[in-house]
Amino acid sequence: MNNQRKKARSTPFNMLRRERNRVSTVQQLTKRFSLGMLQGRGPLKLFMALVALPRFLTIPPTAGILKRWGTIKKSKAINDVRGCRKEIGRMLNILNRRRRTAGVIIMLIPTVMAFHLTTRNGEPHMIVSRQEKGKSLLFKTEDGVNMCTLMAIDFGELCEDTITYKCPLLRQNEPEDIDCWCNSTSTWVTYGTRTTTGEHGREKRSVALVPHVGMGLETGTETWMSSDGAWKRACRMETWILRHPGFTIMAAILAYTIGTTHFQRGLILILQTAVAPSMTMRCIGISNRDFVEGVSGGSWVDIVLEHGSCVTTMAKNKPTLDFELIKTEATQPATLRKYCIEAKLTNTTTESRCPTQGEPSLNEEQDKRFVCKHSMVDRGWGNGCGLFGKGGIVTCAMFTCKKNMEGNIVQPENLEYTIVITPHSGEEHAVGNDTGKHGKEIKITPQSSITEAELTGYGTVTMECSPRTGLDFNEIVLLQMEDKAWLVHRQWFLDLPLPWLPGADTQGSNRIQKETLVTFKNPHAKKQDVVVLGSQEGAMHTALTGATEIQMSSGNLLFTGHLKCRLRMDKLQLKGMSYSMCTGKFQIVKEIAETQHGTIVIRVQYEGDGSPCKIPLEIMDLEKRHVLGRLITVNPIVTEKDSPVNIEAEPPFGDSYIIIGVEPGQLKLHWFKKGSSIGQMFETTMRGAKRMAILGDTAWDFGSLGGVFTSIGKALHQVFGAIYGAAFSGVSWTMKILIGVIITWIGMNSRSTSLSVSLVLVGVITLYLGAMVQADSGCVVSWKNKELKCGSGIFITDNVHTWTEQYNFQPESPSKLASAMRKAHEEGICGIRSVTRLENLMWKQITPELKHILSEIEVKLTIMTGDIKGIMQAGTRSLRPQPTELKFSWETWRKAKMVPTEPHNQTFLIDGPETAECPNTNRAWNSLEVEDYGFGVFTTNIWLKLREKEDLCCDSKVMSAASKDNRAVHDDMGYWIESALNDTWKMEKASFIEVKSCHWPKSHTLWINGGLESEMIIPKSFAGPVSQHNYRPGYYTQTAGPRHLGKLEMDFDFCEGTTVVVTEDCGNRGPSLRTTTASGKLITEWCCRSSTIPPLRIKGEDGCWYGMEIRPLKEKEENLVTSLVTA
């Protein structure tokens, strides 16, 4: 083992002397010199070269170099740089002489001011291009040369997509959590972030959108009987039974009569009550074609139109018409909101503050186009702060929407329905759904719901339609995205977490919830990245699963829905009624074709002479004894010889003969129709139930089971009315009811099944016809009993004050009336004046319903209905029908019957005394007119609708005027004015239940010519007819008669216990006077100047009065009771 100590390596210190070597090695000298140069020491020229070297190599200088650079003398540094510039110039000349590009050499020069320099809020602001990435940026400031280092990794092309933030001042410390810093003063920097491919940074995730499935929106496409449909049906049955106890009892009687066991009776009753409320269920598909047959002698019929269906109407002595609803469009929808589903961000700017320096702010925060966010971030020495801690940071970016989707509100008044009407003319394609040249196209809108269509050769048909879209537009929003549209629930639409604009905002700058499409990344010390989410179109399509898609055509939106129309046929006429029957021979052009509706189409050709003529066609049984079936094409005619004619008919089930023409040459065609009459009965009943279900609560005759019975009653009246009238003429209605009850009771207790069914049927019909009052289409005068008859209800007779009235005014729709009243109140109308006392009774009956309808939509208005005393005063304004009606549900009806509404400060006065707060000049008057006569228990319902325009005339539909032999009468439901011919026509008597302020219409006035208004006994302003029949020699207009009493009897006779003499000494004409004084004393002596005897007498509730021409002879004026009225 070698124990010898190894030689120590030479060290800079002598271990014995403990001192440094006097002479340094070459390595030590080189190292010492290099470190000194990097720390800023050494010769100036060498230092200047060392400063240029990092610029060439894009290496950041050290702190020592930067310190020396700031301390050297300016003149010496400039001289050295100029000398360097001369040397570089010589090098450029040499290179230029070599005719080669010297651009590479130029890139070696330090890039001083190679960027755009500006200021921001008084501080330097660099706008840097992509070429400066990773370089030190130098520019001169008041404190000297400022060098900024930019090490950002998201450098891109300079465009509108930029990032702006502040580079902090950093001299001694190492940079921390920053990518830009400066050595002299903090500086703003802006650079672009767009890549060479033109893409922007964005997030690919989508917003969390709630699916639309399960929102429970009725859109017209739901399946009948969903999972919870059974419970809804049970609820409807319960509420219907509570609302219609009378008809429920009748249904129970029918069920008990028909059923033989308790189970059968219960099942029949449940089925009846289940069908009855089906009018509240919507969206049940109806058959492709529906046959609606009008009542004989009726002037109108109700039909239901739906897309994809055709309705054929038939009525006696009227042409057969086909109706088809071909299009329902929504135009000019109002925009509710505009949602942004794709956006971009530009001009991102960040400002930050050190701890304890307060909250940072940006001017962009005041600009509504920007989306901003405040955060906190760690700060310290490494990012320009003197203290460590949390500092504030705010980042803003300009939000621009690239793609929108809109939510629109569809108003019912913006819906337009297109209907095609085609008469069965026998020409080709004139059967079924014809939209070609034979059809007449009309358009229906809520603003013009009444439309007339001129059918060439067949007259004019009037349609009054009421839309039934099956949609609650208060809960529906129409969402449009590019060229597609959906019906969505309003609340779901309003809750979408997307940036949106109000519909009224046309500039698009004030977008709300912009942050839902923006993601702010975790902030750095001086910078925060902001990205925008990707397009949300795909996410919206996913969320819209289950929503109903709507078709669009020419920018308009196509809807489903139903149209309930009242078809008025009074102006229709059959073409060819005056033609004679065809006597020639017919030929079958094409074999009989059976349609899917149970009808047949026969195409025949006439080969005889004498055209135009009517085609004889009958369908008979095999024995050719009984005519069966019916003609769909009413009164088929031939217009030209050898021209084919189409005839549609409905043969009975089984075998039958179709006979065309007359003998000889008569065509006899055998036909067999498959099917069952009983089955067809059930099928027709189901079709009627579906038609009921489509229309909803108020649209159809079948508004309830009572409506079903009422509709059956129309047929019963037509079939059995004449027999019933003959059998029970002169019998009171109580006796009729009693007879019906007895017959029904006997039938229910009969042991014979056939006898029991027959008696029950007869009893029920007797009960129905006895209890129900049917109305015709107007009023006529009964001369025998001196009465006005409207339908079978007698109203005005000689004994007017017994009030044996059988009429009841009803509004066409309380919800429509409430809508008109709300609009009137908004326009400053404070109340209503009734035209007749029946109208006043109607207002009293429906006031609770109107109150609840208005309270449901939170209209704070109290409706108060008062009584009528004396004259029915006139107003000067009127109610106007509105395009939309208010909601009127069964809950509202039930509350109106049971729960009073809360009073409000604002009132709407109906009748009652005139007050200063609501004078007659500010009240609506004469706004209603008779729309139709209907059915009712014990009374005839008269349905009223709102007038389209103002009118001073009384409603002519409750008036009549007639003249026969030597008698004439003008009458309505409150007046009976009778005149007689005795040498000349003159008034005999008049009865008044009320005194109206409307004008008697000329259409119901006899002998208009020749009469002066000043000579009319009953003034024109009090509904006196301007006629010679309203005249009496010696008397003038009774403008100051005692009409303040209301009920009056006017005739020509002496008041009891008084005398009247004609003398020139009599007093002047004046207000009517009562024959008794205020104390009850009878004034016996009266006179007149030139009036005829007997005098004009007026009987009121307080006694007997004389006309204005009759004056007292002796009584003092202060004792007289005078009339309070001046016309």
From Swiss-Prot:
The chain crosses the membrane at residues 102-122, 239-259, 266-280, 726-746, 755-773. GO terms for cellular component: extracellular region; host cell endoplasmic reticulum membrane; host cell nucleus; host cell perinuclear region of cytoplasm; membrane; viral envelope; viral nucleocapsid; virion membrane. Residues 101-114 form a propeptide. It comes from the Viruses. Disulfide bonds join 283-310, 340-401, 354-385, 372-396, 465-565, 582-613, 779-790, 830-918, 954-998, 1055-1104, 1066-1088. It comes from Dengue virus type 2 (strain China/D2-04). InterPro entries: Env_glycoprot_M_flavivir, Env_glycoprot_M_sf_flavivir, Flav_gly_cen_dom_subdom1, Flavi_capsidC, Flavi_capsidC_sf, Flavi_E_Ig-like, Flavi_E_Stem/Anchor_dom, Flavi_E_Stem/Anchor_dom_sf. Residues 1-15 are annotated as: Interaction with host EXOC1. The lineage of its organism: Viruses, Riboviria, Orthornavirae, Kitrinoviricota, Flasuviricetes. GO terms for molecular function: protein dimerization activity; structural molecule activity. This is Genome polyprotein.
